């Protein structure tokens, strides 16, 4: 599948404006470590300390089951599966304890001949419920990010490091990443993307087998050890929702990744 990147300037600007990232186009010369922040005015009023009664907050916490030993993964069998049989196999996976708490697996979705493979970290509550990756607010932001570089969501393939949601949206555990790795590796082999965009620390470090902080991994071109596919690292959309000032850096990463395709 060939990407045309055919958005005209006015359309692209409309998507950037919708994301409140119009400044990305005009601040290219700034270092990633010197992004300007707007100081909000603060009003400090001296007053007597008044102790307020503490309100009781009811918090729901999902209880994780007793962890079973990681089941042996039949890598040889998985390596012979096509995408349809692989997805069916993933649906019945019980290789780690996450199968006890998931609502459903999240295999991935998109164009099977896509040039771009987008890999996130793990499904969240929305994804666990819908069975598709990036369907919540972070997914909406990802869609806008792709549009800004001329890509429709339907033109790429989107997956995660994990196929099941960790309880309470905690970070994936190493043994869970290991249990899912054969599935993801086979997906990559079958999809044969021209480039992989790794979203977030867990995705980047797992794919590239590195413990380097994600901030130091950005802005470089990597190649997967297993199949030499070019890989670019950037921040996860969920992080951008919490830290919108970092959007400019992600815009630079997206342009860098696109350049690898069209050069």
Specify the residue positions occupied by each region the protein language model found.
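A polyanion-binding, active-site-adjacent surface
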Residues: 2-263
């Amino acid at each position: 599948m060939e990407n045309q990147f055919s958005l005209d300037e006015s359309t692209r600007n409309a998507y950037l404006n919708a994301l409140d990232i119009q400044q990305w186009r005009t601040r290219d010369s700034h270092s990633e470590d010197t992004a300007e922040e707007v100081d909000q005015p603060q009003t400090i009023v001296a007053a007597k300390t008044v102790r307020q009664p503490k309100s009781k907050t009811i918090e729901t916490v999902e209880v994780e089951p007793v962890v079973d030993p990681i089941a042996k993964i039949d890598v040889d069998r998985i390596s012979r599966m096509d995408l349809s049989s692989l997805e069916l196999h993933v649906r019945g996976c019980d290789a780690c304890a996450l199968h006890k708490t998931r609502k459903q697996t999240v295999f991935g979705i998109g164009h099977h001949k896509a040039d771009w493979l987008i890999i996130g970290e793990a499904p969240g509550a929305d994804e666990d419920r819908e069975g598709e990756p990036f369907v919540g607010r972070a997914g909406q932001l990802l869609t806008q990010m792709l549009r800004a570089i001329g890509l429709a969501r339907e033109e790429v393939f989107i997956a995660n490091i994990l196929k099941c949601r960790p309880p309470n949206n905690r970070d994936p555990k190493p043994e869970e990443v290991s249990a899912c790795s054969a599935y993801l590796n086979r997906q990559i082999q079958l999809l044969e993307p021209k480039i992989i965009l790794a979203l977030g620390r867990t995705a980047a470090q797992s794919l590239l087998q590195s413990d380097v902080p994600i901030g130091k991994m950005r802005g470089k071109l990597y190649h997967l050890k297993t199949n030499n596919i070019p890989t670019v690292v950037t921040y996860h959309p969920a992080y951008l929702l919490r830290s919108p000032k970092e959007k400019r850096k992600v815009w630079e990463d997206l342009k860098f990744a696109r350049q690898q395709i069209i050069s």
